[in-house]
Design a protein with these regions (language model features):
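Hydrophobic/aromatic-rich alpha-helical bundle segments in the mid-to-C-terminal region
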Residues: 107, 111, 122, 144-191, ...
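Short secondary-structure transition hinges
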Residues: 94-137, 173
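Hydrophobic alpha-helical connector segments
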Residues: 61, 75-102, 153-160, 183-186
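Amphipathic, non-transmembrane alpha-helical scaffold segments
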Residues: 9, 17, 63, 67, ...
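Helix-turn-helix
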Residues: 2, 15, 23-57, 61
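N-terminal intrinsically disordered/low-complexity leader segments
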Residues: 1-10, 201
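Amphipathic alpha-helical packing segments from all-alpha helical-bundle domains
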Residues: 68-79, 119-145, 154-158, 184, ...
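Generic hydrophobic, amphipathic alpha-helix propensity
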Residues: 12-20, 37, 62-66, 70-74, ...
Length: 201
C-alpha cells in the first residue's frame, strides 16, 4: 500500500477502512467488489487504487491493520493478573466493544478472514491470522483450568463462542447497531454459561 494513506485526515481513513471492512465481511473475498467499497466510502475507484493498488492490496492491508489494532485493544482491556476464564472472556468482549465503536465490522472481518478459502486471500493473510490467534491464545492461556472445567466444558465453551459471534454478526446487519448494547447482551450470555459451570462444580 501507499504509506501516504496515513497522511489523509483520520475521518477519511476510517471511512475507507470501515467501508472495506464491511464489504469484505459481508461478502467474503471472492464476492466483495471494489465498486461496492468505493460506493460505501463515497470515494472514487482511482483514489482507492492510488493507495492500495488492487483488491488484494486492500484486503491484505485490512488484515494487517485489524490484527494490530485489535491486539492493542486487547492489551488495554486485559488484566494480566486475572485467572478466571469467564472474567477474562468479559475483558475480551470489552476489547471487542471498544474496537467496534470505531470499526464496527472489524471483528466480523477477522472472523470471515479466518474462514476464507480463496488462495490469493489465504496467502496474503497467513501471518495476520497467526498474529491474531497468538494474541487471543496468550490471553486465554492465563485462565486457570478449574474455572472452566466440567463434564461438558468443551461443548459449553464452543456454544458460547458461536452464540456470541452469531449474535454480534446478526446485529451488525442492523443499521441501529450499538457496540455498548451488544457488549451488555454478550456479557449476559457469558454469565449464563458461567452459572452452568458453578452448578456442575
Amino acid at each position: 500500500m501507499n504509506a501516504k494513506f496515513f497522511d489523509l485526515k483520520k475521518e477519511k481513513q476510517d471511512r475507507m477502512i470501515n467501508a472495506a471492512l464491511k464489504i469484505f465481511a459481508l461478502n467474503g473475498y471472492s464476492h466483495a467488489s471494489t465498486d461496492e467499497i468505493v460506493k460505501e466510502a463515497h470515494i472514487s475507484k482511482g483514489l482507492l487504487f492510488h493507495y492500495f493498488e488492487s483488491k488484494i492490496g486492500v484486503y491484505s492491508f485490512l488484515a494487517d491493520y485489524s490484527a494490530k489494532y485489535f491486539a492493542l485493544e486487547l492489551s488495554s482491556a486485559i488484566d494480566v493478573m486475572e485467572r478466571d476464564y469467564f472474567k477474562i472472556k468479559k475483558m475480551v468482549e470489552n476489547a471487542k466493544m471498544q474496537t467496534m465503536k470505531t470499526y464496527p465490522f472489524m471483528l466480523f472481518f477477522i472472523n470471515t478472514m479466518k474462514k476464507e478459502n480463496h488462495p490469493e486471500a489465504v496467502a496474503a493473510t497467513k501471518d495476520q491470522k497467526v498474529q491474531y490467534e497468538n494474541a487471543i491464545g496468550t490471553v486465554y492461556a492465563r485462565a486457570e483450568a478449574e474455572s472452566f472445567e466440567g463434564p461438558n466444558s468443551e461443548a459449553y465453551l464452543k456454544m458460547l463462542d458461536l452464540t456470541l459471534e452469531a449474535l454480534t454478526e446478526d446485529h451488525l446487519r442492523d443499521e441501529s447497531f450499538n457496540a455498548e448494547s451488544q457488549y451488555k447482551e454478550n456479557v449476559s450470555y457469558i454469565d449464563v454459561i458461567a452459572g452452568l459451570f458453578k452448578k456442575e462444580s
